[in-house]
Design a protein with these regions (language model features):
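Hydrophobic alpha-helical transmembrane segments in multi-pass integral membrane proteins
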Residues: 49-55, 112-124, 171-185
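Hydrophobic/small/kink-forming positions within alpha-helical transmembrane segments
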Residues: 14, 44, 48-52, 56, ...
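Short helical (or helix-break) motifs at transmembrane helix termini and adjacent helical loops
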Residues: 13-24, 84-87, 113-118
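Selective transmembrane alpha-helices of multi-pass membrane proteins
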Residues: 9, 63-89, 158-185
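Structural signature of hydrophobic alpha-helical transmembrane segments
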Residues: 2-18, 67-77, 129-143
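Juxtamembrane transmembrane-helix termini in multi-pass membrane transport proteins
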Residues: 3-59, 123
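C-terminal ends of transmembrane helices
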Residues: 21-34, 82-95, 144-160
Length: 185
């Protein structure tokens, strides 16, 4: 596998985290560099961790994750998306400025489950996992931080409709993940 191939894989894996980061930026009252960094570290960290786990533990958990991973991602993203849509009708006092571990952990897990499967395939190809997972993590970190700022630019002017769209996007990502996992897509 070439470096170019790996970069394309990293960008592809980071798209869900990028979309969720945009949603976080949309729904925050005031976005700072700290918020962008938090999203980048959480999503980039999990996008680094999951391929490594898939590489080392894939034989033991691949079947289980293949069976339940899409459902887990769907439920987490659908619940968070529905909550965003609901909160968008509540006014500014309902804005989501929560970048705590409790808020970020389910998002990081939901957006990185597919990276576990990539790690399993990397093991089958006998790739050197640390540089590969590192590149995936760094690209996801950067794109996620950018996503928060992009979301904030639109959120300031179009907060309620943008938050509704963000919630719908999260639900659609969950549905896509589920349908892909079930072999429909």
């Amino acid at each position: 596998m070439t470096l170019f191939d790996l970069i394309l894989i990293a960008i592809s894996l980071s798209m869900d985290a990028f979309a969720v980061s945009i949603c976080k930026g949309l729904s925050a009252r005031k976005v700072s560099l700290q918020h962008a960094t938090i999203c980048g570290v959480w999503f980039g960290g999990f996008q680094f961790l999951m391929p490594a786990l898939g590489y080392f533990l894939g034989d033991r958990f691949a079947a289980l994750l293949t069976k339940f991973g899409p459902w887990i991602a769907f439920v987490l993203l659908a619940l968070i998306g529905a909550s965003m849509i609901k909160e968008s009708f509540g006014g500014d006092e309902q804005l989501d400025d929560d970048y705590s571990a409790k808020a970020m952990l389910p998002l990081a897990i939901a957006t990185s489950i597919d990276a576990f499967a990539v790690g399993v395939s990397f093991a089958a190809m006998q790739m050197d996992i640390l540089p590969a997972a590192g590149l995936i993590g760094v690209i996801t970190c950067l794109l996620s931080a950018i996503g928060v700022k992009v979301g904030a630019m639109f959120g300031d002017k179009y907060r309620a409709p943008a938050e509704r769209i963000g919630g719908i996007v999260l639900i659609l990502i969950g549905v896509k993940t589920l349908l892909t996992g079930l072999g429909v897509l």
